[in-house]
């Protein structure tokens, strides 16, 4: 959520900055004026409420004086009762006006950083850099075929039990998946990240502070039972985001770096018909996530953003998977992101780059809703500063596994990346269990 003061010119704000950001996103510009109007209405109601409270205090003092002097205060007492009724109604108006304002404010995306390519077409994503030598042979097997040839997942039984996109990892598939998780956690620990295994579900009110409204329909599974409804997490970012809810964090403690590990659950309602085979796009997967908090001052969060994408790059370099890093166009940014990089790894069988990593700087957009503040607790609302929050995939392991299979395949099986071998009991190669059909 944006700072409401950005919309208040009399408070030093500049609504034109918000309008320009909305233009870059291909989103409504008119909403800025709607918010300004709603804000003025809310503040007017607040002013009227304060006047009623002042009147109440004034009348009460007059009643006290009359009682001391023995005068008749009955008419004034009647006025206080009328004032109480008016105040109660005005409080309801204030709350209604505030709800209308913030409901609208929450639909405006974060301010798009000036370095983001402006377009609504993802074909215009800017390639920042590439790494590695791509395999270009013909007749390579794709990850769906390789999973079957190796016997490392049972998709048929998975679909029978869990429905479409269901799967069982099996044998070396389990070991390879766990190897990626353990390698990822070791990798981040060496870079001063604190590991966190997150809850797999969240309360609705907390999830609402971490996820966009559209995600509730397209991504999130609802869990019902005793007590409040809960939602399964779609990414470790969501519970990591809420970890410091309502906290004051001293600047000397920043930056904070977390390595989140979790299973994730997605309905994938918006991707119907895409990648229905294999384990690339599934409803349940494991993830190791980078999540960082920085001071809001200077370029701290932007330097951290570059550090985080470099971490992800180094991870895939150690796996020896060719990739490109792209800067995502303004029209494809989610609401929270001011800027986002994707790391897309090379899948040689389909001869295309596919996204394995998303790395976003969300500045103070999420921390405002979550009240994650920087500094010492202050009574002055205007003096509050909010931490900047950043997130980046390190590995969504089933996707990374698919990429490894395609890049490390041979005629007889699949080689295991050298950095994963210590986590595989020293195993270096997976043999095909089925013969390749010529």
Curated annotation (Swiss-Prot):
Keywords in alphabetical order: Aminoacyl-tRNA synthetase, ATP-binding, Ligase, Nucleotide-binding, Protein biosynthesis
Record-linked InterPro entries: aa-tRNA-synt_IIb, aa-tRNA-synth_II, aa-tRNA-synth_II/BPL/LPL, Ser-tRNA-ligase_type_1, Ser-tRNA-synth_1_N, SerRS_1_N_sf, SerRS_core, tRNA-bd_arm
Pfam family, one: tRNA-synt_2b
Binding site for ATP: 266-268, 282, 355-358
Disulfide bonds: none
EC number: 6.1.1.11
Top EC class of this enzyme: ligase
Keyword Protein biosynthesis assigned: yes
Any one GO biological process: seryl-tRNA aminoacylation
Pathway assignment: Aminoacyl-tRNA biosynthesis; selenocysteinyl-tRNA(Sec) biosynthesis; L-seryl-tRNA(Sec) from L-serine and tRNA(Sec): step 1/1
Recorded family membership: Belongs to the class-II aminoacyl-tRNA synthetase family. Type-1 seryl-tRNA synthetase subfamily.
Subunit structure: Homodimer. The tRNA molecule binds across the dimer.
Summary of the function given for this chain in its UniProt record: Catalyzes the attachment of serine to tRNA(Ser). Is also able to aminoacylate tRNA(Sec) with serine, to form the misacylated tRNA L-seryl-tRNA(Sec), which will be further converted into selenocysteinyl-tRNA(Sec).
Protein name in UniProt: Serine--tRNA ligase
């Amino acid at each position: 959520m944006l700072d409401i003061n950005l919309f208040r010119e009399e408070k030093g704000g500049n609504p034109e900055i918000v309008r320009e950001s909305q233009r870059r996103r291909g989103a409504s510009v008119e909403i800025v004026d709607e918010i300004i109007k709603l804000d003025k209405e809310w503040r007017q109601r607040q002013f009227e409420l304060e006047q009623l409270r002042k009147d109440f205090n004034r009348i009460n003092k007059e009643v006290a004086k009359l009682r001391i002097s023995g005068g008749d205060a009955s008419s004034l007492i009647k006025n206080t009762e009328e004032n109480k009724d008016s105040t109660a109604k005005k409080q309801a108006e204030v709350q209604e006006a505030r709800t209308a304002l913030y409901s609208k404010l929450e639909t405006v995306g974060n301010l798009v950083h000036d370095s983001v390519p402006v377009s609504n077409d993802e074909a215009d994503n800017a390639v920042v850099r590439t790494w590695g030598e791509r395999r270009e042979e013909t007749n390579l097997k794709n990850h769906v075929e390789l999973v079957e040839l190796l016997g490392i997942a049972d998709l048929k039984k998975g679909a029978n039990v869990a429905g479409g996109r269901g799967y069982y990892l099996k044998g070396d598939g389990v070991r390879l998946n766990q190897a990626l998780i353990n390698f990822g956690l070791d990798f981040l620990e060496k870079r001063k990240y604190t590991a966190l295994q997150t809850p797999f579900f969240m309360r609705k009110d907390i999830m609402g502070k971490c996820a966009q409204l559209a995600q509730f329909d397209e991504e999130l599974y609802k869990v019902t039972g005793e007590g409040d409804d809960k939602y399964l997490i779609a990414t470790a970012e969501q519970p990591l985001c809420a970890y410091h809810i309502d906290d004051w964090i001293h600047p000397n403690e920043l930056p904070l770096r977390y390595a989140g590990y979790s299973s994730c659950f997605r309905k994938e309602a918006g991707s119907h018909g895409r990648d229905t085979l294999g384990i690339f796009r599934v409803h349940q997967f494991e993830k190791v996530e980078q999540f960082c908090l920085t001071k809001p001052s200077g370029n701290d969060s932007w330097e951290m953003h570059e550090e985080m994408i470099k971490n992800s790059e180094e991870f895939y370099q150690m796996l020896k998977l060719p990739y490109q890093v792209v800067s995502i166009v303004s029209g494809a940014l989610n609401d929270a992101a001011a800027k986002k990089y994707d790391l897309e790894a090379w899948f040689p069988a389909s001869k295309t780059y596919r996204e394995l990593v998303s790395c976003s700087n969300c500045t103070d957009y999420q921390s405002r809703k979550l009240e994650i503040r920087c500094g010492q607790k202050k009574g002055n609302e205007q003096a509050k500063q909010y931490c900047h929050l950043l997130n980046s995939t390190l590995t969504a392991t089933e996707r990374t596994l698919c990429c490894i299979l395609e890049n490390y395949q041979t005629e007889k099986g699949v080689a295991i990346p050298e950095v994963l071998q210590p986590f595989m009991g020293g195993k270096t190669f997976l043999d095909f269990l089925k013969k390749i059909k010529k």
